[in-house]
Amino acid sequence: MNRRAVIGRLSLMLGGTIIGAEFFLSGCKSDPEKINNLFNADDLALFNEIGETILPKTATPGAKEANVGQFMALMVNDCYSPEEQKIFTNGLTKLNDRCKEQYGQDFRTINAAQRTALLTILDQEQKKEAKNNQHAVHYFRMMKELTLLGYFTSELGCTKAMRYLPVPGKYIGCIPYRKGEKSWAT
């Protein structure tokens, strides 16, 4: 065997190894869109839009800036029971279906006034269900609670929406409060 034949066969084997490995490893890639077991990046964006509709940006940052979508996904995935997770995920589907029914678009593409109107209706429905003492929690109540909890426990919520005094600070047992002032975060 001469040197040219050996080099030709080696390059063929090496090329086949590289191409074969790339083909084999292409099946090992995970879906980059997946956030956790239940939600993907589109769901996260939807959570942020729901949160921003509930707590919009004003003189203080809104829920989207506090990234409540990430908080909601984490809490539902890690802290909710399978039954509660099912209520929540089915609720997302119901929300988008209802939105498409009323406006012909999904929640993320309708305007702010339409979002507010839809969430106001859902809020009224969940209040009626709570008054009727129905056992299952309404999915919108879960979304609203998670939005508020995520926002007011975030750094932006604590430092920008409420008064914040970093610890350690001196203890003042009685602080005068005037109506309309921010409440204390700590």
Could you say what each language-model-derived stretch is?
Residues 54, 58-67, 181:
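Long, well-ordered alpha/beta core segments of mature domains
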Residues 36-39, 57, 61, 84, ...:
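Generic alpha-helical structural element
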Residues 7-26, 111:
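N-terminal export signals
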Residues 1-5, 21-57:
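C-terminal segment of N-terminal export signals and the immediately downstream linker at the start
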Residues 49, 67-186:
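Mature-region segments of soluble proteins
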Residues 39-45, 62-63, 133-139:
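Structural motif
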Residues 23, 28, 63-69:
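Short alpha-helical hairpin
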